[in-house]
From Swiss-Prot:
Zn(2+) binds at H63, E66, H160. It comes from the Bacteria. Pfam families: AstE_AspA_cat (PF24827), AstE_AspA_hybrid (PF04952). Keywords: Arginine metabolism, Hydrolase, Metal-binding, Zinc. Disulfide bonds: none annotated. Transforms N(2)-succinylglutamate into succinate and glutamate. It is an enzyme of class 3 (hydrolase). The gene is astE. The lineage of its organism: Bacteria, Pseudomonadati, Pseudomonadota, Gammaproteobacteria, Alteromonadales. The keyword Cell cycle does not apply. This is Succinylglutamate desuccinylase. It catalyses: N-succinyl-L-glutamate + H2O = L-glutamate + succinate. Its cofactor is Zn(2+). Binds 1 zinc ion per subunit. Belongs to the AspA/AstE family. Succinylglutamate desuccinylase subfamily. It comes from Shewanella baltica (strain OS185).
Length: 344
């Protein structure tokens, strides 16, 4: 495996050739500047001999059909392995769900991004590949962040693409973080990366980014980089700014960020999440409605169990509507413009 990676510099290809696990860990050096450690399939760490004090996690492929972030991360890994760029920050890349990537599907058995913060081991337990992998990914995050002294900035960008078109092509979800202000610097980093829209979540979740934020105090985000396309069919010119800023972050080049300015970004607050309680749940709007479509107060969004679910605020925008989820799961997130958010 070591020789295959050294020859090809293609970590994604090696991962997909061995989607369940590698036969043990291995490591090697890039010149005298970087130690590379491969912990598992889809798990690779770049340890600079001299680092600048940030611990960066870039994860992708938690959903197997969300290919643009996978190609983006593999491109960065390849540049690092080819020594075209040199890491100056500790960096962990995670390719989340290799089995689903090979399958060309979002999931194998279950939505992995609902299985973190220990949810993987709640009943029925570790009964499918996503649950097993989520537990391992948590362990790799823990190993990475706790291998060095506290006090360093921890960052985790969990990269996705959405199943539908969007009024805002690229957007990020800022996990709930009670008692901690939102980072204006991080929001402006996202804006410089082409991600000009941020949703402030209002409650704990079992997503990957919330896990890193809550457990390790990381500046963590779920980042949606556009729409789902098959592997190899993404227009990677749409990610030039994202690639550039991630490269600057990893190599510790000046980020040259603007000061936080709420007028330069679109900020939303999650006002509620609507979960499914009955099999007859259905939305009243078209199935192909775009993310961030806005509806006025009193509009009937959905019906289930003989009840109507209506817009409660003057206007609410919807993201991720999906009526076909299992009972108990989220069908949609409702948003209002963020006012008085504690951004510093």
């Amino acid at each position: 495996m070591l020789q295959a990676l050294l020859d090809s510099k293609d970590f994604l290809a090696l991962t997909l050739a061995h989607p369940e696990q590698f036969d043990g860990e291995f490591s090697f050096s890039l010149g005298d500047h970087t130690q590379v450690e491969v912990w598992d399939t889809g798990v690779i760490v770049f340890e600079p001999a001299q680092n600048e004090g940030k611990d960066v996690v870039l994860s992708c492929g938690v959903h197997g059909n969300e290919t643009a972030p996978i190609e983006l991360c593999n491109g960065l890994i390849k540049q690092l392995l080819q020594q075209k760029i040199i890491a100056k920050q500790r960096t962990l890349f995670l390719i989340g769900n290799p089995l689903a990537i090979n399958n060309g599907t979002r999931i194998i058995d279950e939505n992995m991004n609902r299985l973190f913060s220990g949810e993987h081991s709640n009943p029925p337990g570790l009964v499918n590949p996503e649950r097993v992998r989520a537990k391992k990914l948590e362990a790799y995050i823990d190993r990475f962040y706790t291998a060095v002294a506290d006090g360093r900035q921890r960052i985790h960008y969990d990269l996705h693409t959405a199943m539908r078109a969007s009024k805002h092509e690229k957007f990020a979800i800022y996990p709930y973080r009670p008692g901690r202000a939102f980072s204006g610097e991080q929001i402006m980093f996202l804006a410089a990366s082409g991600v000009d829209t941020v949703l402030f979540h209002h409650e704990p979740t079992t997503t990957f980014s919330y896990f890193s934020s809550e457990r390790y105090g990381a500046d963590a985000f779920t980042i949606e980089l556009g729409k789902v396309y098959p592997m190899g069919q993404n227009d990677m010119t749409r990610f030039i700014a994202t690639h550039e800023m991630f490269m600057r972050l990893i190599t510790a080049k000046p980020l040259e960020l603007d000061a936080f300015d709420a007028d330069k970004v679109n900020l939303y607050q999650v006002c509620r999440v609507i979960n499914k309680h009955f099999d007859d749940f259905e939305f009243t709007f078209a199935t192909d409605v775009e993310n961030f479509r806005s509806f006025p107060k009193g509009f009937v969004l959905a019906r289930e169990g003989g009840q109507e679910i209506k817009v409660e605020h003057e206007f609410e925008s919807v993201v991720f509507p999906n009526a076909k989820v299992p009972i108990g799961n989220r069908t949609v997130i409702c948003l209002i413009p963020a006012v008085n958010a504690d951004v510093r």
